[in-house]
């Protein structure tokens, strides 16, 4: 119970039954449980799924019924404003993937499709502009005074990659009993021994997606975690 990431599988595992190098913990989504039950009752595999169409560019945000691996090109006909450049994401903005080309299909674990604006505009002297209409995790912009305001987020990174600076923001985003700044730093430099000792084996990409979103240095911690986990698997 609580705000994101309280509902993530990784958060539940951490507090109930954390995995480690000698223990594997499995999870299953509620729609897959329904499909398994239907298989036992009828003998037929139910591949239908209920997903949401969401995001600032969605004309009619709602729930729809579709099938596993459905073509998003077909699903999203007339679903977004074509006068705006749109990025289609299979999954959430935090842990989904850009669905285009050969990947323009519903992901195996995606429960939503997100439509956001492709934005590469640069703001002149943005670092000293009060920016009352731009969201920030840290209260450094004028928008911090708009407690109940909703923001239409885009693909704009609002900056470039730079050195990682420990600001204390990661500690406010991760509910697990970790040292997040030290863990994320070990992932960046591929120090898998330190990463394991700090709890990397309990995580997957979505568990640290908020850190990627809030990082002032613009690092992709999800891909760094995956690279470290693959290295750990290969080296033992």
Where are these regions (language model features)?
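Buried, small/hydrophobic-residue-enriched core segments of structured protein domains
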Residues: 1-74, 78-236
């Amino acid at each position: 119970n609580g705000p994101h990431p309280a509902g993530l599988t990784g958060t539940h595992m951490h507090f109930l039954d954390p995995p480690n190098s000698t223990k594997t913990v499995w999870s299953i989504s509620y729609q897959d449980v329904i499909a398994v039950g239907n298989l036992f009752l009828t003998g037929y595999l139910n591949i239908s799924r209920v997903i949401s169409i969401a995001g600032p560019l969605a004309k009619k945000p709602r729930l729809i019924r579709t099938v596993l691996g459905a073509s998003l090109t077909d699903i999203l006909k007339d679903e977004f404003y074509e006068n705006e450049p749109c990025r289609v994401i299979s999954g959430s903005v935090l842990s989904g993937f850009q669905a285009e080309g050969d990947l323009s299909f519903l992901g195996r674990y995606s429960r939503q499709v997100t439509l956001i604006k492709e934005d590469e505009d640069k703001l002149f002297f943005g670092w000293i502009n009060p920016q009352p209409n731009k969201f920030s995790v840290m209260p450094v912009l004028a928008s911090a005074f708009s407690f109940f305001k909703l923001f239409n987020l885009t693909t704009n990174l609002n900056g470039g990659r730079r050195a990682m600076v420990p600001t204390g923001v990661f500690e406010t985003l991760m509910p697990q009993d970790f040292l997040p700044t030290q863990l994320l730093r070990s992932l960046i430099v591929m120090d898998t021994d330190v990463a394991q000792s700090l709890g990397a084996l309990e995580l997957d990409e979505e568990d640290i997606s908020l850190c990627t979103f809030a990082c002032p240095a613009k690092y992709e911690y999800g891909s760094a975690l995956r690279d470290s986990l693959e290295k750990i698997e290969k080296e033992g």
